Amino acid sequence: MKTLVIISHPSVDESGSQQFLIQALSDRSLEQVTLHPLEKTYPDGVIDVKHEQELLKSHDRIIFQFPFYWYSSPPLLKHWQDEVLTEHFAFGYRGNKLEGKELGLVLSIGLAEKEYQTGGQEGYSISELTKPFQAVARKTGMTYIKPLSIFQYAYMSEEERMGLLIRYQQYLTLKKPDSLKPREEWVIAALKETATETLGTDHSDFIIEQVIEHIEDNRMELDELRMHIDNYHE
């Protein structure tokens, strides 16, 4: 699976969250991920429509990555949509070039997650506020993926940022990023790769083996719990 990450940010080089996400992609991930920063590619705002459409056709998952300004995207990403997602390409007669692909969002958000719910400062959920993107996916025949929302990156601890790094890599590369089992398998594969790279350091190998065993034991417990629940409903 190939993923195209379309980044829109008026000052991407000065953005702490965007630079963290860009640097979070390991060499292993970059083989299947294309980063495409719009403002750096088109500083004059003139979109190469044919090039953009070819990029879309050559990837399976399309990600819009941007700061969530006024419940929408920065202006260049909206302009990109107007120019690139044209009739006869993305919709309409023979406009099926995006059909079967996936559309996801990576949103950097300045407020706390609790504010995006009934009773919160914003009063609406992220799911409600991103309905226009869900509509784009529906109109173009793409499958919409639940957004990866990053709340208050500047206040995240080092541990929280490490968790974000893993979620981000999984969101871009896993076939089912919302499913628990593929996420577990991804972590186990990454740990085994780390063990191979640190071969010869017995202490590190032991810790990694213990973590893998713990994950697999938890999975077995979850499978047993699901079995009991299924039997109860029968």
Question: Which role does the model predict for each range below?
Answer:
Residues L30-P43:
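A short beta-strand-loop structural module common to alpha/beta enzyme folds
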Residues E102-G104, G110-R183:
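Conserved, surface-exposed functional patches that form binding/active-site neighborhoods
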Residues L4-I6, T34-H36, I63, G104-V106, ...:
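Hydrophobic/aromatic beta-strand patches that form the interior of the parallel beta-sheet core
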Residues I150-E234:
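C-terminal and late-domain segments of enzyme folds
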Residues M1-E31:
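N-terminal beta1-alpha1 ligand-phosphate binding loop
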Residues Y42-K50, S157-E159:
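Structural motif
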Residues G16-F20, I47, P75-H79:
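Generic recognition of short, well-ordered alpha-helical segments
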Residues H51-Q134:
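Helix-loop-strand module that forms the ligand-binding subsite of alpha/beta enzymes
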